[in-house]
From Swiss-Prot:
GO cellular component: cytosolic small ribosomal subunit
Gene: rpsB
Cross-referenced HAMAP family: Ribosomal_uS2_B
This protein's name: Small ribosomal subunit protein uS2
NCBIfam families: rpsB_bact (TIGR01011)
Matching Pfam families: Ribosomal_S2
Residues spanning the membrane: none
Keywords: Ribonucleoprotein, Ribosomal protein
Protein family: Belongs to the universal ribosomal protein uS2 family.
Chain coiled-coil ranges: none
Length: 242
């Protein structure tokens, strides 16, 4: 499993919170103090809490669970997509559509439409259409890909959400809470930690910090999945030997 040291976190700026006037008092237990009117996060709390979160993500991955990475603000967009691809999981990195989890039935229909359009674009159907109609379908496909591309192969609700900014993604967290889906989230000093099962107190704005969280999560998930494949193969081999 990926190990992230306090030094790694300091170098990535994980300890820098938001301006003190924007703080959420519920984050007080995780704040070390303030410097130049900016809250400083207590990394002695963050390191073990991040380890717990990574252990949990690993255990979900080892049971073939589906992990949904959520990060729709600009600092996270590309990194979220890369991390999810790296560990063969799922992601939402543009606008969170209300009902993405709680109205899965409708989302599933949109995913089906996206896959139909993708098939049409490959099998020559678009070429038989008028230019205008082909353009309309291409635009529809691109729009659906942007919002649903990261979950089109999820095949049902996720087993856990890994969220980059609890404040920015509060709708996603609320939907997960309503469905009893566990939430692992980076929670900055301006955010409400309620509804987050595995709180990771940390900077949710600095790109280096965001990449640190995502890389560690992706590595942990990947390792757990690979370990599960090895164990499975050994068990299968053991069964065959009898």
């Amino acid at each position: 499993m990926a190990k992230v040291s306090m030094r790694d976190m300091l170098q990535a700026g994980v300890h820098f919170g938001h301006q003190t006037r924007f703080w959420n008092p519920k984050m007080k237990p995780f704040i070390f103090g303030a410097r130049n009117n900016v809250h400083i996060i207590n990394l002695e709390k963050t390191v073990p809490m991040f380890d717990d979160a990574l252990n949990y993500l690993s255990s979900v991955a080892s049971k073939k669970g589906k992990i949904l990475f959520v990060g729709t603000k600009r600092a996270a967009t590309e990194a979220v997509k890369e991390a999810a691809a790296n560990c063969e999981q799922f992601y939402v990195n543009h606008r969170w559509l209300g009902g993405m989890l709680t109205n899965w039935k409708t989302v599933r229909q949109s995913i089906k439409r996206l896959k139909d359009l993708e098939a049409q674009s490959l099998d020559g159907t678009f070429e038989k259409l008028t230019k205008k109609e082909a353009l309309m379908r291409t635009r529809e496909m691109e729009k659906l890909e942007k919002s649903l591309g990261g979950i089109k192969d999820m095949g049902g609700l996720p087993d856990v959400l890994f969220v980059i900014d609890a404040d920015h993604e509060h709708i996603a967290i609320k939907e997960a809470n309503n469905l009893g889906i566990p939430v692992v989230s980076i929670v900055d000093t301006n955010s409400n930690p309620d509804g987050v099962d595995y709180i990771i107190p940390g900077n949710d704005d600095a790109i280096r910090a965001v990449q640190l969280y995502l890389n560690a999560a992706a590595d942990s998930i990947k390792t757990a999945r690979e370990l599960d494949i090895v164990v499975q193969a050994e068990q299968d081999g053991f069964v065959e030997a009898n």
